[in-house]
């Protein structure tokens, strides 16, 4: 009996030792794998994220999962007043909530906003509209020079910008350290009196790499001469932060308005009210910095790229969570002690409050534009409408900044609501002035037409979706195919990696529904 017990104990011990040895060997294998690093020369073809996979396989595999975020909301159908607010501008044609990074480049190509160029010198938008979509952009800035990159039409680089947002946008290919790859961010930080990327802590860098794109910006018209002395004009991405950003819980929107007014800048002239307008981009950084998480030093990556554990390996999840509430155990619950359901309820309440003020603000803004258009029709002069247009310009930018980054209501809920209320207030002040102006010109009972559906709003904005869609499909069948053919021939991207990226014929479009 004693012999049997001794034998059993020995077998258990041997088994445990075998498991321990296996575990040690597996951890050693993982350690060696993690110790792999590119040579001092860096990663050849670093713009292709798959070239990083041999060194960082887990990060690459999680990055590929950005493909899973393939749904979107047609924001113009959800909020038709936006069409009136942006009438005469590309956003009145097509505006969707973002999908995963995997789709960012193709969605840019497919958007009605980028038009239907027929060659490298045609189309409505400048090259700057590629800037936040691909690691090929910093490559082109390095190869061609910053001013040359920002000179010309969007279609100029159609066959060159083919790799979607990936490793090389945020990492040094020699060390994998975080790195800013575009020059406008540091210039903006310096203008705001903030530390540059290189001067910042590692924790701050985990937000600043995101701020390369998730910021408010405009295209600064810049005259220059090339090496041959030829005069050229660049449209350079520039951050309007000279009056500060994220101070004392304020995103800096009023400072941006002051900046834009002082340089007499406008993105476009509204085709109904004839107001020189400003279009907010995606100011995620500014609102994060003014909100409680930013003030407490919680980075973008803490919530959107939380650490995950695989065996003995801890790494940052590069799926870039669209909604951290989908993985609360990895993000929220590392700090918060409330239940998941309670936290979800709090976030939902913030969203509902934003939605309410959003509807009120843009209803007033849309009506202010239409009433101004009626005043013009009745004979009101530019001088009579000067204050009205100033209020519309300022009010719409405040409200637009509040919603242009879809997570603002969470990142800085108080600032989001403040700006929506302020924008609505400006629009209402404009409408009160318009009552007097309209009456002066004999219009006593004008009621703005309905714009409660996307179709009604686009008709008022004179947006011909059928014609725009036909032009876009022709572009996709011609010039875009030439781009793809050239990119493939020159080995600029891996067609296999992106074979499913174009979902235009799968109903994943606001204008080409199947």
Curated annotation (Swiss-Prot):
Q: Which Pfam families match?
A: Cytochrom_C552
Q: Which UniProt keywords are listed? A: Calcium, Electron transport, Heme, Iron, Metal-binding, Oxidoreductase, Periplasm, Signal, Transport
Task: Name the positions where heme c 3 binds.
Answer: 101, 210, 213-214
How does the cofactor bind to this protein, according to its record? Answer: Binds 1 Ca(2+) ion per monomer.
Q: Name one GO cellular component term.
A: outer membrane-bounded periplasmic space
User: Could you tell me the Gene Ontology terms of the biological process aspect for this record?
Assistant: anaerobic electron transport chain; nitrate assimilation
Q: What extra comment accompanies this record?
A: X-ray crystallographic analysis includes a sulfate ion that is thought to be at the substrate-binding site.
Its biological purpose is as follows: Catalyzes the reduction of nitrite to ammonia, consuming six electrons in the process. Has very low activity toward hydroxylamine, and even lower activity toward sulfite. Sulfite reductase activity is maximal at neutral pH.
NCBIfam families per the UniProt record, alphabetical: PRK11125.1
PANTHER family named among the record's database cross-references: CYTOCHROME C-552, CYTOCHROME C-552 RESPIRATORY NITRITE REDUCTASE
Q: What is this protein called?
A: Cytochrome c-552
């Amino acid at each position: 009996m004693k012999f049997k017990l001794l034998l059993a104990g020995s077998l258990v011990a041997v088994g445990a030792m075998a498991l321990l040895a296996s575990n040690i060997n597996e951890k050693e294998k993982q350690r060696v794998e993690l110790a792999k690093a590119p040579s001092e020369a860096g990663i050849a073809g670093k713009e292709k994220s798959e070239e990083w996979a041999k060194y960082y396989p887990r990060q690459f595999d999680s990055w590929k999962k950005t493909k899973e975020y393939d749904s979107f909301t047609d924001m113009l159908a959800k909020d038709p007043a936006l069409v009136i607010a942006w009438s005469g501008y590309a956003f009145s044609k097509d505006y969707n909530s973002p999908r995963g990074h995997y789709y960012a480049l193709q969605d840019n190509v497919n958007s009605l906003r980028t038009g239907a160029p027929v060659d490298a010198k045609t189309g409505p938008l400048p090259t700057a509209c590629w800037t936040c979509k691909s690691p090929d952009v910093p490559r082109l800035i390095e190869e061609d020079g910053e001013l040359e990159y920002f000179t010309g039409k969007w279609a100029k680089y159609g066959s060159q910008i083919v790799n979607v947002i990936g490793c090389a946008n945020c990492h040094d290919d020699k060390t994998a350290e975080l790195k800013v790859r575009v020059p406008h961010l540091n210039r903006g930080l310096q203008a705001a009196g903030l530390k540059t990327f290189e001067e910042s802590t590692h924790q701050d860098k985990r937000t600043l790499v995101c701020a390369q794109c998730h910021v408010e910006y405009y295209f600064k018209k810049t005259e220059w001469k090339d090496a041959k002395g030829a005069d050229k004009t660049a449209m350079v991405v520039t951050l309007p932060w000279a009056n500060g950003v994220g101070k004392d819980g304020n995103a800096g929107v009023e400072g941006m308005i002051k900046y834009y007014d002082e340089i007499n800048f406008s993105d476009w002239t509204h085709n109904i009210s004839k107001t020189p307008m400003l279009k907010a981009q995606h100011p995620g950084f500014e609102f994060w910095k003014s909100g409680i998480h930013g003030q407490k030093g919680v980075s973008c990556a803490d919530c959107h790229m939380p650490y995950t554990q695989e065996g003995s390996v801890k790494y940052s999840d590069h799926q870039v969570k669209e909604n951290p509430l989908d993985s609360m155990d990895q993000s929220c619950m590392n700090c918060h002690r409330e239940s998941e359901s309670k936290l979800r309820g709090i976030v939902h309440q913030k969203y509902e409050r934003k939605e309410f003020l959003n509807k009120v603000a843009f209803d007033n803004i849309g009506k202010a534009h239409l009433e101004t258009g009626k005043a013009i029709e009745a004979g009101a002069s530019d001088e009579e409408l000067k204050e009205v247009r100033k209020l519309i310009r300022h009010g719409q930018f405040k409200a637009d900044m509040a919603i242009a980054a879809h997570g603002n209501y969470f990142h800085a809920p108080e600032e989001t609501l403040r700006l929506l209320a302020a924008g609505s207030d400006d629009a209402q002040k404009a409408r009160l002035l318009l009552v007097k102006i309209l009456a002066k010109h004999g219009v006593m009972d004008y009621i703005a037409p309905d714009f409660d559906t996307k179709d009604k709003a686009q008709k008022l904005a004179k947006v011909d979706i059928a014609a725009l869609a036909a032009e876009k499909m022709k572009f996709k069948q011609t010039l875009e195919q030439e781009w793809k053919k050239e990119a493939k021939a020159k080995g600029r991207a891996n067609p296999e990696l992106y074979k499913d990226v174009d979902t235009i014929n799968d109903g994943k479009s606001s204008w080409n529904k199947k």
